[in-house]
Amino acid sequence: MVCLPESPRWLVKKGYYTEAGKVLAALYSTTEEDEAVLRDLEFMKSDVRKNASTGSFKALLSTGKGKELQRCLIGSSTQFFQQFTGCNAAIYYSTLLFENTINLDHRLSLVLGGVFATVYAIATIPSFFMIEKVGRRKLFLIGFLGQGLSFIITMACLVNPTKQNAKGAAVGIYLFIVFFAFTILPLPWIYPPEINLLKTRTAAAAISTCTNWITNFAVVMFTPVFSDTSGWGIYLFFALINLLAVPTAWFFYPETAGRHLEEIDLIFAKAHVEKKWAFTVANEMPKLSYEEMQQMSKDLGMNEVGEDYVEEGEGDGPEKKDFSSDDEKAAHEG
């Protein structure tokens, strides 16, 4: 962590354009004078100027072209579903579930709990490669559907609790954690910052994280009570929540993989103007070049100093920058 640079967008926001160029050059494995680096640096400057004021929590209530409220709710919903799909019920109480709900002996339950944690750790590895290649939206759908079916297997085996069915119930729990580890575990931490507008990203991320811990607390508190009341009912409950999350992800989660953050703004603005689902616009819209993003921004009426993202009288305007070198000052003025 000590060796990691600041993000180029943060450096641009603070006026450190030279440092931002160096980070972009390192990301692209090229020089600071490369056309792609200069283009992205200029586009970041433009976006930071448009969204110069830091959005308050009140700004999240906006429903205009920026779709701040919808985007905040989408980000928070990913954290809600992460918890209410049963992950921590399985993770925290895996040994107890094997022993008390599936009725395995104590020693075997401890062994299976250790194997469960090992499988969980190993199953996270594919996410490093799949998140960009497969995409966020598809992984959400795969995760929710796979988790739901896994808990249906567990529930069905526990309705008639025999020794043979207990093995099937354990398989269902293992399948659940495999699906969770490479899909719904990482995605809710990646998706909300990508989906939210630059000026409201901090406030929206705070709400998203708060949603995670509130729902985490709720699930951990009611799981033992629910499990004691109905051994198979708790798995039916979590299965239904997972299956409910599938249409939610389908209709409300546009794909963000491979997109500039500015393209996400255009997707929601275009969806607002054309009265379409954001995921439909994202599917129809090809990856845009810098010039195409500028032109679409003009076409959608988003080119006036963040007119659709900053209400009249809101904020104090762009923050004055302190530059650490003459080069940065010249870059800012030029």
Regions found by a protein language model. Give the residues of each.
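Cytosol/matrix-facing amphipathic helices and coiled-coil assembly/linker segments
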Residues: V37-N51
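Short intracellular "coupling" helices and adjacent cytoplasmic loop segments at the cytosolic face
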Residues: A26-L38
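Alpha-helical transmembrane bundle of multi-pass membrane proteins
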Residues: M1-A26, V48-G334
